Design a protein with these regions (language model features):
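N-terminal secretory signal peptides that target proteins for export/translocation
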Residues: 1-8
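Conserved beta-strand positions that form and line the central face of beta-propeller blades
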Residues: 42, 310, 337
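Alpha-helical segments with a strong preference for the paired helices of cellulosomal dockerin domains
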Residues: 311-333, 341-361
Length: 362
């Protein structure tokens, strides 16, 4: 009987979505947020076919050093209200920059709507990934003094943490670091709610319909596990700096530990930090990670500066890199797989020789 009841519960939850519209999901323009250093902007998105809003925070050096270019930190918000955290987050990172523990960065706060999961919806009505990657990032690069290249860190919390994983793994050419904070959903079946979840079955079913079209195959296709399985060689080869972090009281701990083990099984370098006594809250988690957490941002930006052909990480492309490449010739999962095609080949050697003598590209 329990099995039948579970099936019935799922059926009723899914069919409920037939009576729920897209109203809460399709909000391309938010109200402005007022906070020191924060700007509210809109742009025309080709993917969305309409105006889309975003917020951006600029460091004081953006005005005082008008010739300077800056790395970009992209923060992907969690589900629900995507703008309420902007004042706290901008102040938090501003303080760290003022203290000199991380370099000045531009912070981009995209509008991910309440429940987009930062994913292109199955029916095409909410092409969230394309809006962010294909439209918003080029717009920001064209209108703000960003360094470009891989001088970007992709970070997010909850829904945004899951999105940071999927988008960051998929586009290793755009991001040198990705940070999955309190990330979810990471379960293999979205309709299997984690213990303690505060998302009702009806809302969960509504999200499943509107984002993944009630299509288990599409959910799996867009799952970070699927993406990193396809992209492991590129993530490893490009030395993308990957971290997971969440609180010990977060209901998403088991699925994040499972994802940690999955990354380990693929040989993907990463870290997992579980902060004692912290629940599902970005404003509690980030301070709880302590001073040492700033090493993640600095490592990612240092990696962005390193030419991909600097295989040994010495800071310059030299004979040591040639030696390592030749030793790994034909191997998979090697940092010497510069073009991330899955193996160390002659094309990697050609790229290295073209870059011989090159140092940091910033």
């Amino acid at each position: 009987m329990r099995g039948f009841a579970a099936i019935l519960e799922r059926f009723l939850a899914v069919t409920t979505t037939l009576y729920v519209g897209m109203g809460a999901f399709a909000q391309w323009v938010t109200a402005p947020v007022t906070a020191p250093g924060v700007q509210y902007q809109t742009f025309q998105s080709a993917a969305a076919g309409q105006t889309v809003s975003f917020h951006v925070w600029l460091p004081s050096e953006y005005t005082s050093q008008p010739a300077r270019v800056f790395p970009l930190l992209i923060w992907l918000h969690g589900s629900g209200d995507g703008t309420s955290g902007i004042p706290w987050l901008s102040a938090y990172f501003s303080t760290a920059m003022a203290q000199g523990v991380i370099p000045p960065m531009i912070i981009l706060f995209p509008n991910g709507m309440p429940y987009s999961m930062w994913c292109d919806s199955r029916d095409g009505r909410v092409p969230m990934e394309r809006v962010v990657i294909d439209d918003l990032l080029p717009f920001v690069d064209a209108n703000y003094r960003t360094i470009g290249g891989r001088h970007r860190i992709l970070e997010g919390f909850s829904m945004g943490g899951q999105g940071a994983g999927r988008l960051g793994f998929r586009r290793t050419d755009l991001f040198a670091g990705l940070s999955m904070l309190g990330a979810g959903p990471l379960q293999d079946d979205f309709l299997e709610a984690p213990l303690g979840s505060d998302i009702s079955p009806v809302k969960r079913a509504m999200i499943y319909q509107n984002v993944w079209g009630n299509d288990a195959a599409y959910y799996t296709l867009q799952h970070p596990k699927t993406v990193i399985t396809q992209q492991a060689a590129a993530v490893i080869g490009r030395r993308t700096v990957v971290r997971q972090a969440l609180g010990s009281l977060d209901t998403l701990v088991p699925m994040n530990q499972d994802f940690d083990a999955f990354l380990t099984s693929l040989g993907v370098p990463h870290t997992l930090t579980v902060a004692p006594g912290i629940g599902h809250s970005a404003s509690d988690l980030l301070p709880a990670l302590g001073f040492g957490q700033w090493a993640f941002y600095n490592a990612a930006l240092a990696e962005a500066c390193r030419p991909l052909t600097d295989v040994d990480g010495s800071g310059v492309v030299d004979a040591g890199d040639v030696s390592l490449l030749l030793l790994d010739f034909g191997m998979t999962g090697s940092p010497a797989d510069v073009d991330a095609d899955g193996a160390v080949t002659g094309s990697d050697l050609a790229m290295l020789l073209l870059d011989f003598g090159t140092a940091c590209d910033a």
